[in-house]
Amino acid sequence: YHKIMYESLLELDPVRINFNAAGMHTINIVLSFIMFGVALGIKPQQFTTMLKNPKSTLVGLFSQLVALPLITFILVVIFNDIITPTVAMGMILVAACPGGNISNFMSSLSKANIELSVGLTASTTLLAIITTPANFAIWGGLYVRYVNKHAADALQMLEIDKWQMFETVFILLGIPLVLGVIFARLLPKVTEKIKKPIQKLSIVFFLAMIVLAFSNNFDLFLRYIWFVFFIVLVHNGFALLTGYSVASFFKLKDADRRTLTIETGIQNSGLGLVLLFNPKIFPPDLHIGGMLFITAWWGIWHIISGLGISSYWSRKNVKES
């Protein structure tokens, strides 16, 4: 079975999603709009609350920026015989992305610590300017060098231009985030009116972005979705479990445990897709279809798994500890 899975996943690699300049701009605008929506929910006092309770914040950052990439690397090593190099690199890329924008909505649904959730999403997003290229380079480099000797051929020594990645992340995440915070500060009444609609629109735009990107390869998507589904199911399950386990290990209170579970399990895979679509970062002659499919399906699946966990927790009272 694992041979069938490996060979099937190999067939994804030649898939290349080419956008013209207008298409690329549209996708960049969508991601920037999503991040602007996240920023509208950020209030300066949330950061002071985080500073008063630094333990949960530091544990949350550790869970997302260190534990998740490490657990992902271990999974990639375990799955080495059944997943292709590009699928492995797709998993590593998703783990290197910051927290996803829908995690704040899910945290409020889960009766979790919403201030911690917003603070962590904002922090990991700003830190992503450094941590996304760094985590991808470190764990991806270890994988190519030590885990899968064929990976170097398959990926033609994926030499990522770290500065280009840094610049892209800064423009798409950093700038909209800062603009959103300034907008919310200057126009608080307008912000209250538009915040919820923008966050709902964000999810619709993100799903539309994935559907449009893969519409030409929909038959392939349907043919191999089960293999991709299984890998993302396991990876996302371990991401959620990592958040919960790390929070439990450090004896955080129940509301914070829920926040960390969601923050670690919900990743900004939209950023991953935008990086993959950028020809300056991933040259068009690279066969990285496996990375595209993993990152795209993660973007859909974490909404389903996140809502599942949130609806379960919404019925459970938070334990006071």
Each language-model region and where it sits:
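Intrinsic-disorder-associated, low-complexity terminal segments enriched in Asp/Asn/His/Tyr and depleted
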Residues: 1-2
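Alpha-helical transmembrane segments of multi-pass small-molecule/ion transporters
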Residues: 5-321
